[in-house]
Every structure is written in C-alpha cells, then in structure tokens.
Design a protein with these regions (language model features):
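Perimembrane helix-loop-helix junctions
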Residues: 8-9, 158-159, 185-211, 282-283
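Membrane-embedded helix bundles of polyisoprenyl
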Residues: 18-21, 93-110, 115-153, 165-173
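Hydrophobic, aromatic-rich transmembrane alpha-helices
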Residues: 99-111, 194-195, 264-292, 296, ...
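Extracytoplasmic catalytic/substrate-binding loops of multi-pass membrane glycan-assembly enzymes
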Residues: 32-46, 52-75, 86
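Loop-to-helix entry region of an early transmembrane alpha helix in multi-pass inner-membrane enzymes
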Residues: 66, 70-73, 82-101
Length: 348
C-alpha cells in the first residue's frame, strides 16, 4: 500500500510539473504578437483554410505554397477551433503540449527516482525552449515527433518490442505530412531500423513495404489534388552544371554554419563529440553504431540539401540552418541522456 501511494504521489507530481510548464509556455506564447516568416506566409494562411471549413481540395488552390504538407496547419486550426475565444495563438498551444509530452516521454525512465527525472525534464525545457520555435514554424513538431520516435527506436533495439514498429510507422507518417524534409528524416530512420540486428527479416520486410506504401499514398494524394510533390529550387540542370569553385564555396559555408548552429543548439554538437568518443565501439552493430549511421546520414542530408539548392547559399543558410539543426536534434537527445546515465551506473 505504501509503494502504491508513493507511486500515485509521484505521478501527481509529474502531472503538476508538466502543467506548470505548459502554463508558463502558454502565457509566453500568448504574450508574443509576432509569427515567424514562414508561418506568416505559409503555415498560418493554410491554417485559415482549415479554420474556415475549407479542405485540402481548396488548399491546393493556394499556389504560392501548396507543395508543403499541411498537417501542422491543420493542428493549428483544429485546436484553435476548440478553444473558447478561438484566438490564433490557442492553436499553437498544441505545439507546446506535444513538445512537453515528447520531453516527458524520454525523461520518465532515465533515473529510478522520479524526482531526478522531473529535474531532468525541467532542465531540458530550460535548455531547448525558444519562442521562435513556437511562432507558427513547424520544426518544433518535427523535433517532438523525432524525440518520441527515438524513444520507440531505443526500446525496439533494447527490448525487441516489435510492436513499436507500428508506432514508429505512425510517427514517420506524421513527419511526412508536416514538412517536405520530413521524407529525409523518415528515410534516415528507415535505413537505421533495417540495420537492427535483433529484428527478424520478416518484420523488416513488412516494415519496408508499409513504409514505402505510406510514401506512395502521399504521392497519390498530391496527384489527385493536383498539388506539386515538391517546388523547392532543385533542378537537375543546375546540379549537373555546378563547378568546382562553387561546390567548394558552398561546402565551406555549409560547414561553418552547421558548426555555429550546432554550438548554439548544443545537442547536435554533443552528439558528434560522443560519437567520436565512442568510435572504438563502432566495430559491431550496437546502439552506438546505429546512432552513428543516423548521424552520418543526417549530415549528408544537410550538406546535400544546401549544396544542390539553386539559391544564394549565405541567405539560405542564415534563414534555415538553425531550424534544420533544431529539428534534427530530436533524434539524438535520448542518446545523450543514455550515454551519461549509463556511464554513471557503470562506475558503481
């Protein structure tokens, strides 16, 4: 009975801390009047379509930016319509809720003592929260979903719980419908899971078939509503005609901006340092090896995304690299936590 009461008391503390942070962030979001640039021109306008009872059919007429997925804008409109006053910012509170839930999920079982988990939960919010991410931009949704998926991937590796594959697929499908680059994150996770040594070939085949069916389904829906699959400035002719000087110039600046924003984000930077620190453990397929594959593919994606884009490189890096690094870091936060807690346990 004592242990039961203690367990319920800990759960109550968890709920109280969660809603205290949610209230603080909600007040902060409500006190800000500015939306992010992409939010003003893309995501908020799309949310208005849904808010005014329009559908994806009408949204396909928004030719200025019809190709970006619409799920984040739908959440914005849906939760706005559920609120009492239906102010614009109330829809964005769902972003904060998902963000807090995702951090709670990865911190709930790091330590045996619940109080330590709550301290860690509070610390991570303090480190990662910035209003800019909640100004209508979609990267916080990607970050949050990647946190949840990373937890599912860890449990799949550690405990061989193949039921997690279904939930991973649901997470990847959501990511596909939030931003265009969601396909890159989904493919990275797809490749990494197929490296898992403890999953049967049959399960991997089923996972792969369903994964590609989800991508095909998205393409078919876009075709049906006559929406461009992608309208980003990537052209085969431009890629084939890149000269060596421009390639070197772009790679140099990508490296500089990636390093700078990794230091600002710190999660991405620490991941790179830990992978180097654990390099001797990469000879066999273990959790460190899987994170290494994930991180390398992530770096390749970032470099390719900017290298082959027909846009002024400095402007492109200044306006987007910070958000790319932030959303990507959702893949690695749990890895960092596990690294330090496992080392602490090994000393005793």
């Amino acid at each position: 009975k004592i242990s039961f009461v203690k367990h319920k008391f800990n759960e109550l503390n968890e709920i109280i801390i969660f809603f205290i942070f949610f209230l603080i962030i909600a007040v902060h979001i409500a006190s800000k009047l500015n939306l992010g640039w992409d939010a003003k021109w893309f995501w908020y306008i799309k949310s208005l379509f849904y808010y005014q009872n329009q559908t994806i059919n009408e949204l396909s007429n928004y030719t200025f930016n019809d190709f970006h997925p619409h799920l984040g804008s739908y959440f914005w409109a849906f939760f706005r319509s559920l609120s009492i006053n239906e102010y614009e910012y109330t829809g964005r509170l769902f972003y904060a809720f998902l963000y807090l839930i995702s951090i709670l999920i990865i911190t709930s079982n790091i330590f045996k003592k619940k109080i330590n988990n709550l301290i860690l939960f509070s610390l991570l919010i303090t480190i990662t929260y910035r209003y800019d991410y909640f100004s209508g931009l979609q990267e916080v949704l990607i970050f949050s979903l990647l946190l949840v998926v990373s937890k599912l991937m860890y449990d799949l590796y550690e405990f061989k719980n193949t039921k997690n594959i279904l939930f991973i697929l649901l997470g990847l499908n959501s990511i596909l419908w939030i931003k265009s680059e969601g396909i890159a994150y989904a493919l990275i996770i797809f490749v990494v899971i197929n490296f898992y040594p403890k999953i049967k070939i049959k399960s991997k085949i089923i996972f792969s078939i369903i994964f590609f069916l989800l991508i095909i389904l998205k393409i078919l829906i876009y075709k049906y509503y006559q929406i461009k699959i992608n309208d980003q400035p990537y052209y085969l002719n431009y890629i084939l005609n890149l000269d060596l000087n421009l390639i070197i110039y772009k790679i140099k600046n990508i490296f500089i901006f990636l390093t700078y924003n990794s230091l600002k984000n710190i999660i991405f930077f620490i991941t790179g340092i830990l992978i180097i620190f654990n390099f001797n453990q990469l000879k066999k397929i273990n959790y460190n090896f899987l994170i290494f594959i994930c991180f390398i593919l992530n770096i390749i994606f970032i470099f390719c995304a900017y290298l082959f884009r027909d846009m002024e490189i400095i402007y492109s890096l200044k306006t987007t690299m910070d958000r790319i690094v932030f959303s990507s870091s959702g893949l690695y936060l749990l890895y960092i936590l596990k690294f330090f807690t496992d080392r602490k346990k090994s000393k005793f």
